[in-house]
């Protein structure tokens, strides 16, 4: 959600901070700010409501420094405003703080320690910077000791903190709990960021931080300590991503670029996880743990949850293992009765989803095995799960996920094939996943090459509607949920996906003249039923659009999909939905990549 950047030891601190914040725009934000110090007695605080471009204009040419911190804020406490933007400042102007997370007990802390302080913002963050100042000025503690004491008062709150002391201007104080932060290691300088993408043009070597750790960062020194104040030794990891991969190139929006990248993502997964004979390359220990499970539990949120619905069908049909799919925010506080030998699979693009992590922590406490499937190496959920599989999809910047969704499904297909073969399931042995993913990649390419067709459909059916419905059965229902979410996210159309058999149980009352109803038909055993449902809504004036596999197509169908194995049709049927959402948003003049009120990485509950 919020983005954090910091740098010490670079004369170009201002441009590094602003460029870093721009690379974090995809996380979602409503205001931004920076604080820089030149270590010669000059410092600058600039905050702005709105976009980074607005902040950059406000900064201008006069602001300079060699150490600084920056932040993009996604409002949780207090409305979007300059006063509530970060950095937040102590009453005497000595301390500056940026923060991602939620301080659960900030009202109690205000009443207990700061009843005499006049606050300038509505944020929980200001409470923290005022506490640090109070412990330094009133109790004579050092900045580090005051910071540590403050952290000890926060209970189970989530936070990623980056603090500066005006009287020690080349030092950054860093702490985290349940919120991602990394230290980027340079030569004669160091950086801090909530996502390595922000600083890949400065360094590709990063130190991960664990919950409860505090770090003191200087230009030529990084000191990590644990909650007890004991030193922690840790080697940096290398991020093998070219910064250019995170650029739009010639595309107008990241989302379109990422839709177009999906065929190559399918091919990449085949290269990484399948040998020349088409056999899965999966860790033996992971397969052993999966074989020992009597039930799989897929836990995810948003688009990843929809990918999990498809994954469950793959595990059950190929490996004959019962599989449940749960929304992570519900599972975290309403855990169902579990089987005797559960195995948990966490689907998360970022590897930082707060709700999913809460479930994983509970799973670890119960000593159950787990797997994280994520696009981000060294992310929190990848570190804390028993096993990790990477999506290898490349950076996904647009808030609305596309290629990570299809990568999650494809990798679950490979894993289900591997497990099925390991437990001697004939269906898995017969399933040629390598050949099918090649067909999928080619099919995706044929679809993304027909952009003009999808723009025409979007303009005709979706551009001027206040609501839309996506229907299907089985796997098509799962895709209906995802494609409706895409339209909802980026074009602000009230779109709903539901099982087509439920039409007569209430939803058909909402159908009127020209209401768009998109029917997805890829499953032979339910094709006739879904067509019947579409005829029912058409008779009531609905404007119907059909997305149909070639082998099931009839005259008058709108979009014809290449034929692939029925278990993988979701990988193709979702692409038209992605493009319809994109072109609806584009022709409404909206910001496709950064829809209102949304964040790419949801790091608070």
Curated annotation (Swiss-Prot):
Active site: 2, 600
EC number of the protein: 2.6.1.16
Catalytic reaction equation(s): D-fructose 6-phosphate + L-glutamine = D-glucosamine 6-phosphate + L-glutamate
Annotated ranges, domain Glutamine amidotransferase type-2: 2-220
GO MF term set: carbohydrate derivative binding; glutamine-fructose-6-phosphate transaminase (isomerizing) activity
Chief place where the protein resides: cytoplasm
Keywords (A to Z) from UniProt: Aminotransferase, Cytoplasm, Glutamine amidotransferase, Repeat, Transferase
Role this protein plays: Catalyzes the first step in hexosamine metabolism, converting fructose-6P into glucosamine-6P using glutamine as a nitrogen source.
Protein name, as recorded: Glutamine--fructose-6-phosphate aminotransferase [isomerizing]
Gene: glmS
